[in-house]
A protein has these predicted regions:
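Conserved hydrophobic beta-strand within the GNAT/NAT acetyltransferase core sheet
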Residues: 85, 119-123
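Conserved active-site alpha-helix within GNAT-family acetyltransferase domains
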Residues: 101, 113, 117, 125-144, ...
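A short helix-loop-beta-strand connector motif used in the catalytic cores of GNAT acetyltransferases and
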Residues: 44-56, 84, 140
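Conserved GNAT-fold acetyl-CoA-binding loop/helix
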Residues: 24-42
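Conserved beta-strand in the GNAT
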Residues: 56, 62-71, 89
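A conserved beta-turn-beta hairpin within the catalytic core of GNAT-like acetyltransferases
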Residues: 74-85, 95, 142
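Conserved acetyl-CoA-binding loop-helix of GNAT-fold acetyltransferases
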Residues: 86-90, 96-109, 136
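Conserved N-terminal entry element of GNAT/NAT acetyltransferase domains
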Residues: 1-14, 153-154
C-alpha cells in the first residue's frame, strides 16, 4: 500500500464527509446534516486559514483517514501557540495499518514547524480503542475534559 499524508482538497470533501460520518454516526446519532453549501463554506474557511491544517491519508488513491490540526496563539506560555486536534478518524476497513500513526507524525511535524509548545486532543470516553492507540504513540492523559453545548438551556 502506498500511503501519502497531504492537505485535503475540495475534491476530497465527499470522501471526508463519509469518513467523518463513521465517527459521527456512532458518537453523535442526533446530529443533523448542515447541508452542502454550509459544508463547502466551512471547508473553504479552513483551507484559507494558515493556522488550520485539514489533512488526509491517501492510500493508493483512496482517502482512508483524516485529522484536523488548529494552531492556537496564546498570551501565556511565552506567547507560544498550542495545537488542537479534532476529527481524527481512519476508515474502519483500514485500521491497524499505520495510517493513524502517519497522520499524527505529520501533525507533530506541522506543530513543531509552528512552534507549538504542546498538542492536545479530546476523545470520547467510550472510544477505548482510540485511547489505547494514542497511548501507544506516547500521548499522555493529563487533564479532565468538560464540554457544554453553548445553546443548551441551563
Amino acid at each position: 500500500m502506498k500511503l501519502a499524508v497531504r492537505a485535503a482538497t475540495e475534491a476530497d470533501l465527499p470522501r471526508l464527509l463519509e469518513l467523518l460520518g463513521q465517527m459521527d454516526d456512532s458518537m453523535y446519532p442526533t446530529r443533523r446534516d448542515a447541508g452542502e453549501a454550509a459544508r463547502l463554506s466551512v471547508f473553504r474557511q479552513i483551507a484559507a486559514d494558515p493556522r488550520q491544517h485539514l489533512l488526509v491519508a491517501d492510500a493508493d488513491g483512496r482517502i482512508v483517514g483524516t485529522v484536523h490540526l488548529m494552531v492556537i496563539p496564546h498570551l501565556s506560555q511565552s506567547c507560544k501557540p498550542s495545537g488542537l486536534l479534532e476529527s481524527m478518524v481512519v476508515d474502519e476497513a483500514y485500521r491497524r495499518r499505520g495510517i493513524g500513526a502517519a497522520l499524527l507524525r505529520e501533525v507533530q511535524r506541522l506543530a513543531r514547524e509552528a512552534g507549538c509548545y504542546k498538542l492536545a486532543l479530546s476523545s470520547n470516553l467510550a472510544r477505548y480503542g482510540a485511547h489505547r492507540f494514542y497511548s501507544r504513540l506516547g500521548w499522555k492523559r493529563t487533564h479532565y475534559g468538560f464540554s457544554l453545548e453553548p445553546h443548551a438551556a441551563r
